[in-house]
Amino acid sequence: FGNVLGSSGSVIPLFQQQISFGGPITITHPEATRYFMTISEASQLVIQAGSIGNTCNVYVLNMGNPVSILALAKQMIYLSGHILKTSESNGDDSGIEIQYTGLQQGEKIHEELFIGDNITSTEHPMILEATESFCEWSMVEEILDQLKSQHNLSAEKLRQLLLQFAVDSTHKEN
C-alpha cells in the first residue's frame, strides 16, 4: 500500500516532532528508500480498485520512484530553518543531527511494492494489478493439521515442516 503522508504512521510527523525538539532525526539506514502517497491518493486507490476488479485481485498505486529517507530528512531540516549537524560541526550544537538506528527485524532497506514481475496495467492509468500466486486453503489446513498433531516440536523440526510446505505449495502451483 505504500506510506501515506500525514497519517499517524507516517515518517513526516515523526521527523517534524524530532526537529521541533532539536533532534536528532532517527533513520534506520542511510540508503533506506520508501514509496509515498497522499491520504487522498490512498482513498482514491481503495475506491478505484474496488470498482475495477473482484475480491481476489491485488492492486497497487503507481507511486513513481522511491524516495530516499535521508534526503527527505535533510530537506525537512532545511525547510524548518535549521542546518544539518555533521561530524565536522566541531562541537557546534546549532544543527540537527541525523542518527542511524539500524534496520528492525524483517525491515528492508528498499521497499518492494510487488513480489515478482507479474504486473499488468488496468483501465485506470495509475493503478497496477499484481498477479500473485497463493496456495489453496486446503494446503493451509493440511499444514495446520500436521502442526497440531506434532507435540513438542523442536525449532529445527518446525522449520523443516514449514520449508517442506513451502516447497510442496510451489510444486503444486506449477
Each language-model region and where it sits:
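Strand-loop microenvironment adjacent to phosphate/nucleotide-handling motifs in alpha/beta enzyme folds
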Residues: 1-174
